[in-house]
């Protein structure tokens, strides 16, 4: 307990030093810009999930490894936390009664017969516009709130998604989704449907790697955060000013809370697999402390943020000027992250959802 208290005290001191040294001005998305070559953007998954590269970042030093090495970076009593959300086939295509095409990107279920969505369309749409999905299903636009539309369906929404929906690949993957994506744009531990984007840091894990980790005495916990469509959207001015992002539903149960406390009691690290897990854990701490919770979060983690729980994270490489590159910069330092991204580009790493990964250890 004394060692852990000293550790926490040092971490708090380091946080304030970071604030004083690097984050004494308000940062803008443009401060996180880096040119990612088109050829560095992964367009499809590797044959083997765990054959991706792993950039190990610790105390500012960079080591090139493979993801299959991840067990070597973990210690007994560490707690590895996964996001068990499951990606829905959330992309639909329909047409207006006039014949104009409409692309529908599902965001969140409201009830069995209605949902929130983002739309792309030719011409105009308005309240009452009907969108024909197939001979059995017609959607009707009920209302609009900024970029989101409330849609009423004449069939159960989940049935329509599963029968007609496509895997919602990110816009930087310049191809149509195929049958392989149904499997590979999903973690092997996905359980709870609700996401419209994969928690991509988890895509690298295989059953064999998880078994190796368990045999080492490392605990594996799970939470749920349903990734929303806002994860692909550019940051808006009001988000920067309010320091709030799009809302996403998350839940943490008693079992995970018990695992967190047990790991901390044994001086283990809390290791988040992905930015979604970071957002869920730090939201829990802000709202409850280490207590079960089911809620929505709009937390916007930027440089200067005081991480209360997460000690290390596994994450993919993120879009420049995005909320996610700002989050990892808050964790490791902006210059350190930009340096590691430049190293990754120079050394042939693959970027974004189907790309390679990082293990960021604060030491």
Predicted regions and their residues:
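Intrinsically disordered, low-complexity cationic segments
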Residues: 6, 14, 22-23
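Surface-exposed, charge/polar-rich loops and edge strands
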Residues: 20-363
């Amino acid at each position: 307990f004394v060692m852990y208290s000293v550790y926490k005290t040092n971490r708090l001191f380091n946080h304030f030093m970071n604030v004083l040294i690097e984050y004494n001005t308000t940062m803008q998305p443009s401060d996180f810009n880096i040119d990612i070559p088109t050829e560095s953007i992964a367009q499809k998954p590797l044959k083997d999930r765990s054959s991706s590269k792993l950039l190990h970042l610790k105390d500012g030093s960079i080591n090139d490894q493979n993801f299959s090495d991840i067990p070597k970076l973990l210690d007994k009593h560490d707690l590895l936390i996964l996001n068990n959300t499951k990606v829905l086939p959330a992309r639909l295509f329909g047409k207006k009664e006039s014949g104009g095409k409409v692309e529908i990107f599902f965001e969140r279920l409201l009830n069995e017969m209605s949902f929130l969505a983002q739309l792309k369309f030719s011409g105009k749409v308005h309240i009452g516009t009907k969108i024909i999905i197939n001979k059995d299903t017609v959607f009707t636009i009920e209302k609009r709130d900024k970029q989101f539309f409330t849609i009423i369906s004449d069939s159960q929404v989940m049935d329509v998604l599963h029968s007609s929906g496509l895997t919602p690949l990110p816009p930087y993957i310049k191809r149509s989704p195929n049958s392989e994506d149904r499997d590979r744009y999903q973690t092997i531990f996905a359980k709870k449907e609700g996401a419209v984007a994969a928690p991509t840091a988890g895509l690298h894990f295989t059953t064999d790697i998880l078994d190796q980790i368990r045999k080492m005495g490392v605990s594996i916990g799970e939470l749920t955060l349903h990734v929303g469509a806002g994860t692909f959207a550019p940051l808006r001015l009001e988000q920067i000013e309010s320091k709030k992002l799009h809302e996403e539903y998350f839940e943490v149960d008693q079992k995970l809370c018990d695992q967190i406390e047990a790991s901390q009691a044994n001086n283990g690290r809390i290791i988040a697999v992905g930015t979604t897990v970071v957002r869920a854990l730090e939201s829990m701490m802000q709202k409850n402390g280490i207590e079960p919770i089911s809620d929505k979060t709009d937390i916007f983690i930027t440089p200067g943020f005081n991480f209360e729980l997460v000690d290390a994270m596994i994450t993919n490489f993120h879009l420049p000027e995005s909320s996610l590159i700002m989050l990892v910069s808050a964790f490791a330092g902006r210059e350190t992250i930009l340096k590691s991204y430049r190293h990754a580009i120079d050394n042939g790493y693959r970027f974004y959802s189907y790309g390679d990964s990082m293990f960021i250890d604060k030491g």
